[in-house]
Amino acid sequence: MATQWEVVIGLETHAQLSTVSKIFSGASTQFGAEPNTQACPVDLALPGVLPVLNRGAVERAIRFGLAIGSTIAPRSIFARKNYFYPDLPKGYQISQYEIPVVQGGQITIQVPANEKAGKDAYEKTVNLTRAHLEEDAGKSLHEDFAGMTGIDLNRAGTPLLEIVTEPEMRSAAEAVAYAKALHGLVVWLGICDGNMQEGSFRCDANVSVRPIGQEKFGTRAEIKNLNSFRFLEEAINFEVRRQIELIEDGGEVVQETRLYDPDKRETRSMRSKEDAHDYRYFPDPDLMPLVIGQDWIERVQSGMPELPAAMQQRFADEYGVSAYDAGVLTSSKAMAAYFEAVVAKAGTANAKIAANWLMGDVSSQLNRDGIEIDAIPVSAAQLALVLQRIADGTISNKIAKEIFTTIWDEKADDEGAADRIIDAKGLKQISDTGALEAIIDEVLAANAKSVEEFRAGKEKAFNALIGQAMKATKGKANPQQVNELLKKKLG
């Protein structure tokens, strides 16, 4: 049924900019304060006060525009978006309409494979229409007041960058891949903390369907304020099914705004969707046009961090890691910094093993404890020493994992923790050929049946003998030496 239809998705993402004060006032943007304690006369729309643009918000918008290869408008205009809502004190929102500060640009996404649908992973470039500055509204609180609604204006005036894509995504998977890539980028650039639980990064999804081959877009529904990647995927998938079923049953899709109910996993109608003319946009007479000279852009450019794509290429060139590994290592700025700190201590020759550890044991432990890489209890220097001891043959990879877990659990603060634990527990790898031969002779004598099976052509028996040898040495034998000596003795 659904194969007759093509899905069309465009996303509008609100990224809360990481400024200390609001976009048009000096009030704090700190999250979690008591209601209405961070709202000044400008935020409250008291008579006789005027907005003053926050330079830091503009610079963050420029930084984003440079990162996505967009055009930074030399002159842009703030406009009043007129609508009534209890948590919008002025009766209008200051935004940008005809001339946004960021125009165009693109983001390349990696869409993961979908085994159930028989689809391989692929890369896609999503074009952006624009990104514009605007202020956030306050918040209506319905749960804490019986029969009433409370209004908290702490959030009113918080700076937002609204990032709008072209309607180029064709599945929920693509939309989620884009949202994750955008989230990673704004956090990497330091322009947004990306905290989705606090509403710092939230998406509106515009979803429509059309018969395959039809050029004209179908009627779209906008799903508002999706603040998790899972909710984004679920909401889009439900909305696609709803629209297809509605059309195939002879109905028509209505242009409207919908909300997603995560408990019922369905979208429901919120209000009819307005068009731009319904908001009666006009230039805000209280704000001068925003003029951005080339010198300002160059100053922002000089302070830009190395971007993920450039860093991925450098990791591949300098450290010899694969393109996939480089992508994982640059999934966050903190992960990339930790990797480079480990390599700086362990040496470039150990870069590949460092990458394997970060994507394997380190990531596993982070997931186990539910923490991010910037909160890891094992320092880069401590992990580097563990890797050096593997490389110089002091310990086996198995023992290294045991040492790493010990350092993690005891939250050791000494840089030489690995050597201390090796000495205290007697974990040095047995590499003495004579000692290993004696142990292997005992293993062969005690496992005559496995020896016979191996000589009869059963390869699994050889692995069993290796396991017995490692067990006899409590994992301290050099696995490569054990392998070679066993082969030699078994003929």
Curated annotation (Swiss-Prot):
Chain's gene name: gatB
Name of the protein in question: Aspartyl/glutamyl-tRNA(Asn/Gln) amidotransferase subunit B
Assembly and binders: Heterotrimer of A, B and C subunits.
Record field: catalytic activity: L-glutamyl-tRNA(Gln) + L-glutamine + ATP + H2O = L-glutaminyl-tRNA(Gln) + L-glutamate + ADP + phosphate + H(+); L-aspartyl-tRNA(Asn) + L-glutamine + ATP + H2O = L-asparaginyl-tRNA(Asn) + L-glutamate + ADP + phosphate + 2 H(+)
Alphabetized PANTHER family for the sequence: GLUTAMYL-TRNA GLN AMIDOTRANSFERASE SUBUNIT B MITOCHONDRIAL AND PROKARYOTIC PET112-RELATED, GLUTAMYL-TRNA(GLN) AMIDOTRANSFERASE SUBUNIT B, MITOCHONDRIAL
Protein family membership: Belongs to the GatB/GatE family. GatB subfamily.
Gene3D superfamilies per record: 1.10.10.410, GatB domain, N-terminal subdomain
Function: Allows the formation of correctly charged Asn-tRNA(Asn) or Gln-tRNA(Gln) through the transamidation of misacylated Asp-tRNA(Asn) or Glu-tRNA(Gln) in organisms which lack either or both of asparaginyl-tRNA or glutaminyl-tRNA synthetases. The reaction takes place in the presence of glutamine and ATP through an activated phospho-Asp-tRNA(Asn) or phospho-Glu-tRNA(Gln).
Gene Ontology BP term (one): translation
E.C. designation(s): 6.3.5.-
Keyword set, alphabetical order: ATP-binding, Ligase, Nucleotide-binding, Protein biosynthesis
GO MF annotation terms: asparaginyl-tRNA synthase (glutamine-hydrolyzing) activity; ATP binding; glutaminyl-tRNA synthase (glutamine-hydrolyzing) activity
Pfam family, one: GatB_Yqey
